[in-house]
């Protein structure tokens, strides 16, 4: 059930979640996200049904965080998700996700609850540029080999499924600065689409401090990748990771534990960057998540039955 209510003269969309218990149905209102990127999305923040509590935005690029009993089994589209000792789990939607997702939670005594999630589709900024020389668009053979090696390292780091649950505690911006690039935008050169931009770009000056948006473990630090220059990946748990690109320096190393708000690196313009800035990316394994939507996540309270 969906309803509208007014707060401070602004209409908010409220999802009424059904709770099934002993043959009756109750409803619990939710608070919609305030970020302009999710105004039209179905937003779940502390939506509770029996054994279901979720926070996030059901939207392409959205990350969902759930909480249940640690003994419960959680499946998304038939695939079992990790559940932490505190009952936290997570999953996300890709940039172009158009499918219906089935979330199933089964308790230790066999009780089962299902929810269908369909991410809202988004429109992205597409820029078309003609007349670019082919020599500019294609890297030299040696550079291409190096770029593939870099990509292999990054993909390996993002496959790690640790038992950490820092993703469930919320995220903060890694830097205070003007946003100059957004998730999902794409350029088409001479009629050929290039890879979309999957990060959130912040303007900055070389040397500006970069903070950990959430606690975690440093999975990767390489100072000189071909495209992304100084590249750092921090594991926040269960496949959720932050990636920082174009860094000028790192104050931590692979394997270090970091806490939310800790200064871990410095802004730069390394790699193929036209000026100093921070490119912050979020992944759920190989699923590219919109960092702007992640900033809206709210921690969930312990589930009790």
Q: What do these predicted regions represent?
A:
Residues 116-228:
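Surface-exposed, glycine-biased beta-strand/turn segments
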Residues 213-248, 276-281:
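Zn2+-dependent peptidoglycan hydrolase active-site motif and core
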Residues 256-276, 280-305:
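Extended, charge-rich intrinsically disordered regulatory tails
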Residues 2, 7-8, 29-122:
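Cationic-aromatic interfacial patches
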Residues 203, 209-213, 244-245, 255-258, ...:
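Small beta-strand-rich domains/subdomains or short beta-sheet motifs embedded
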Residues 8-17:
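Sec-dependent signal peptide recognition
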Residues 209-220, 251-267:
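Short, well-structured beta-strand-loop connectors
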